[in-house]
Amino acid sequence: MITTKELRNKFINYFESKNHSHQPSSSLIPFGDDTLLFTNAGMVQFKDVFLGIEKKDFSRAVTVQKCLRAGGKHNDLDNVGYTARHHTFFEMLGNFSFGDYFKKEAISFAWEFLTKEIKLPVEKLWVTIYASDDEAFDVWHKHIGLAKERIIRIDSSDNFWSMGDTGPCGPCTEIFYDHGEDVAGGLPGTPEQDGDRYIEIWNIVFMQYNRHADGSTTDLPKPSVDTGMGLERISAVLQNVHSNYEIDLFQALIKKAQQVTHAKDINSPSLKVIADHIRACAFLIADGVLPANEGRGYVLRRIIRRAIRHGNKVGAKEIFFYKLVAELVSQMGEVYSQLIDKRELIEKTLIKEEELFLKTIENGIKIFDAEIENLKDNTISGEVAFKLYDTYGFPFDLTADMAREKGLKVDEQAFLAQMQIQKQRSKEAGKFNVDYNSLINSQVKSEFRGYSTLIEDAKVLEIYQDGQLVASTSEQVSAVVVLDKTPFYAESGGQVGDKGILEGIGFEFVVEDVQKSGEAILHIGKLVKGHLNLNDELTARVSDKPRLATAANHSATHLLHKALKLVLGGHAEQKGSLVDENRLRFDFTHDKAISRSKIEQIELLVNQQIRANYPVTTIETSQQKAKSLGAEALFGEKYGDIVRVISMGDFSIELCGGTHVAYTGDIGLFKVTSEGSIASGVRRIEAVTADKAIRHTFTNENKIIAIKDSLKANDTNLIDKIKSMLEQIKNQEKQIAKLKKELLSGSSNDIKETNIGDIKVVVANVDGVDVKTLRNKIDDYKSKNTKVIAVLTTTNADKVQFVIGVSNALTTLIKAGDIAKELSSHIDGKGGGRADMAQGGGNNSANIDQALSQVEKFILNNIKE
């Protein structure tokens, strides 16, 4: 039996023998592409190559790509573990041609690999083609020799692929494997095609058209090929099993899942869920995603919680999920070294999230209890059930069981409708939704000279206006200029683009921003004088002060990154950065606020390196050599085969394409201005350097001097004076609260109380008190009366605030939230709450007496009924 590991290597070796360049898997996070949540196919890392935006030094590639389709092909997470082939995480085997070979070679390679390399029986293979793709039919029938009846024409979107609403697209051919007559299912294109007998194992996409905004298509100048074959699927075929979960890799994980959960049934779907989800979670965390309440972190959190729920379902009595990481590292760590490097972070993250989920369950139950108190009938809405599912991780059946215990039911159809809305959003989020034809797609190459000079003589190669190539541009017109060589740095790696001037005989162009398009550097700005034409010669001048200030901030981020790792730990990895002339911003992984003492340690460490005045050295070398030198590769960056390594003494060494100071001493001074959270597990530090750091220090000193002057204090007694003042304020606030309470008590004689049988009704407006005092008075009424309905308001200018209390014994007659709605309607306000307590406010105090009169009638009418 061929193992998954052997098959992975065999695929790579075969295509390397066909002159394909083996490229490593890209991250699960498609950086620089906001149209996609996760990398979900092998072609994602080559998207800009297919579009002609990015150039590579190879025209053929082979990859084994990490992919995530949070819930499988249709983003249906709940199918994972219950079907034979749904996964969250999977590996995609792929070979690619960028304007090199096309249909004949692509089909031939696939057929040879399947029938010769891994020796699949020809009689087990079927293929589909796009209905009108006669060229593909001829290759299969005439060149490969496949019988006509084994080539199925499909006239649907299943055999036509597009990158988005516009851009590259084309037909595809799919290869299917027949698992045999003992498995249910029919051929592709038949009503029984969704069965498990005929399984798609390889999809070959022929990108030969460009789709325009009006729906029309034109031929691409260089047709390309994109293929994908799921490693897990083809492994199942070769290991003679009908389910992906029966292959060697999954069996090892399932056995470990059974061990740590103490599950009795090894065939439980829950163990498959856990085995699948540990791969998705571990690789997401290794690629820099941490659990959060939105975006990618939210998807990770849901996957973790689903695994935990299934573990509890089969018998887990303690935290267990992290215990599968060791087995995953054993199975896949040799191929994906980041699992080894990030093992500690993965395990700690899973432990913390499982502990958090246990608390979340408790919170969800509280929400459930609060919702059923406000029910008007015996049905919990689908919206509430979905909220419990989506926010608190409650599966529908758990909500239904809890409802059943209280004699209630749940609107399942409304819940499913909410689920469908979410699935549609996820499906749409997985598409490329950009009109690629509107992008500037320059095919020229600009040489960057800005590492060594800020002034360069150059020639105009291209001019764009409104995205269109033009021959010239006029005064006061915004345009984009491409030069043959330039000292201007284009925005990348978190560093903003340069500013400056392009000037020649009779013209001047102000550069406001600089971006990249493929190998072209785009100078974005406005012609403020004269006319600019193609082939004009000019002098490009970068504004030196912004560039030097930006360089100081960029070099400081390298020192900061290293200092964070030394002070906080190796887990403090960069998640993002912004470097301009005014400041630096650095985002990194850390799960709690940084204490003032640690910030001081970080600042001292960075400033020590600045005072050491280390030379900042640069070398260009291979990625492999750079890694051997210990260079830090930054999260989310794309690197070429040859990389630029920036060293600052022996303190910091990173891969970086940005601009830097010559010596660390040129940074001058480093000062942190803020530190805070931007997402769960992600912190942000903002800082300034050089003159701005000095000015920041002056500003803070001046504030302290002003405070000392106001308090008539000095350096020795300032802190004590502030503490004394705060204590006085605290005591005065207590006295004020006491006086307000006495004021309210004194007003009690004026508060109207009505008795309806054994029910006391209190409705009154009390001036000069706050909401807290009203709430305390409401609690006082409820503690002294078993049946009371109290409505208290207070006014300030035109504003109204109110608190409403209803004894628990009366909530079946009337609810505090309903009274709040009635009162709000008379004072231009809003309010709400639980059945026994509500509060709110309004903007019309003029009608308060009339409003309270109406509320009293509302209460009396309800309790008399």
Curated annotation (Swiss-Prot):
Entry's free-text remark on domains: Consists of three domains; the N-terminal catalytic domain, the editing domain and the C-terminal C-Ala domain. The editing domain removes incorrectly charged amino acids, while the C-Ala domain, along with tRNA(Ala), serves as a bridge to cooperatively bring together the editing and aminoacylation centers thus stimulating deacylation of misacylated tRNAs.
Pfam families: DHHA1, tRNA-synt_2c, tRNA_SAD
GO molecular function terms attached to this record: alanine-tRNA ligase activity; aminoacyl-tRNA deacylase activity; ATP binding; tRNA binding; zinc ion binding
Catalytic reaction annotation: tRNA(Ala) + L-alanine + ATP = L-alanyl-tRNA(Ala) + AMP + diphosphate
EC number: 6.1.1.7
GO terms for biological process, alphabetical: alanyl-tRNA aminoacylation; negative regulation of DNA-templated transcription
Free-text function comment from the UniProt entry: Catalyzes the attachment of alanine to tRNA(Ala) in a two-step reaction: alanine is first activated by ATP to form Ala-AMP and then transferred to the acceptor end of tRNA(Ala). Also edits incorrectly charged Ser-tRNA(Ala) and Gly-tRNA(Ala) via its editing domain.
Necessary cofactors: Zn(2+)
PANTHER family linked: ALANINE--TRNA LIGASE, CYTOPLASMIC, ALANYL-TRNA SYNTHETASE
Upper taxonomic lineage: Bacteria, Pseudomonadati, Pseudomonadota, Gammaproteobacteria, Thiotrichales
Keywords: Aminoacyl-tRNA synthetase, ATP-binding, Cytoplasm, Ligase, Metal-binding, Nucleotide-binding, Protein biosynthesis, RNA-binding, tRNA-binding, Zinc
The name this protein goes by in its record: Alanine--tRNA ligase
Similarity annotation: Belongs to the class-II aminoacyl-tRNA synthetase family.
GO cellular component, one term: cytosol
Residues the record lists as binding Zn(2+): H554, H558, C656, H660
Cellular localization per UniProt: Cytoplasm
Main location: cytoplasm
Gene3D superfamilies: 2.40.30.130, 3.10.310.40, 3.30.54.20, 6.10.250.550, Bira Bifunctional Protein, Domain 2 (3.30.930.10), Threonyl-trna Synthetase, Chain A, domain 2 (3.30.980.10)
Cofactor note: Binds 1 zinc ion per subunit.
Source organism superkingdom: Bacteria
Main enzyme class: ligase
